[in-house]
Regions:
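Sequence termini and other peripheral, non-core segments
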Residues: 116, 127-243
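Extracellular structured ligand-interaction cores
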Residues: 72-74
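Loop-rich catalytic cores of soluble enzymes, especially ATP-dependent carboxylate-amine ligases
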Residues: 1-69, 116, 135-139
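Flexible helix-coil linker/hinge segments at domain or subdomain boundaries
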Residues: 102-133
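Extended, compositionally biased non-globular segments
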Residues: 36-68, 81-99, 103, 121, ...
Length: 243
């Protein structure tokens, strides 16, 4: 697709054949909605809910029971593609942004628009398929430009960052630049590398680079780089042995 950002988050991705929209008003109502989908045969178990964000519990082997008993333990984000330009698969700045974005959502007033999940799915597929281009998204039944809506949220996140003293303004600036210039997106950069080197060669070159970097740093203990190398090795082994 011309201008695609993420094939996996578009029609080519792993998803439910029929769109499923659980209830998120409360943990209890969320559980009840999943149980209803299972009883109706829409899905066979909670594991077959392939939404972009899933509520996870203390005991995910018995998810629904544990959610009811223990509440939400953490959120599983399933829409984040692997970043091939970072050897960890995701950059630290992107993680900081996700952290800030979660805080922003906690403070953001909810809309009472009832079709928000349907709109979100349409927006997701539009961004995934044509996200490098300027396009219109749906927001509470109205059309809004992608960049306008994105900048609005980033400005609100900037205010939250300043209010809470989080010192993440650099992260927000990175996202603002990426929103304004599609050539800064990972998708565009990957396509350009593949054009120059070929798909297989590009991936192998990155893999070899990360292997070499890991090998050169095999004795380094992160966070203690200012110590003697022998001390770092000793501390590293101690941690491995649980000391």
């Amino acid at each position: 697709s011309d201008g695609a950002l993420s094939y996996r988050n578009g029609d080519c991705g792993y998803q439910n054949k029929t769109a499923i929209f659980p209830n998120y008003d409360s943990v209890g109502e969320h559980i009840a909605s999943l149980e209803r989908f299972i009883q109706e045969g829409t899905i066979e178990s909670h594991k077959e809910l392939y939404s972009q964000i899933r509520l996870k519990a203390k005991d995910n082997g018995n998810l629904l029971e544990s959610l009811q008993k223990d509440g939400i333990c953490y959120l599983e984000y399933r829409s984040i593609d692997i970043n091939p330009f970072d050897r960890a698969g995701i950059s630290l700045n992107d993680l900081y942004f996700m952290q800030l974005f979660n805080l922003y959502l906690l403070f953001k007033e909810e809309s009472d628009y009832t079709l928000w999940q349907e709109e979100a799915l349409e927006n997701q597929k539009a961004i995934a398929t044509h996200g490098q281009k300027e396009l219109q998204l749906k927001k509470d039944g109205n059309l809004v430009l992608k960049e306008d809506w994105g900048m609005e949220m980033l400005q609100e996140m900037r205010k939250l960052n300043d209010t809470l003293g989080l010192d993440k303004q650099d992260v927000i600036e990175i996202m603002e630049k990426r929103l304004k210039d599609y050539q800064l997106t990972y998708a565009y950069q990957l396509v350009e590398v593949v054009k120059r080197e070929g798909y297989v060669a590009a991936c192998l070159n990155l893999a070899k680079q990360y292997k070499d970097e890991a090998y050169k740093a095999r004795f380094i203990f992160k966070g203690y780089e200012d110590m003697e190398l022998s001390t770092q090795m000793l501390l590293k082994e101690a941690v491995k042995r649980g000391i």
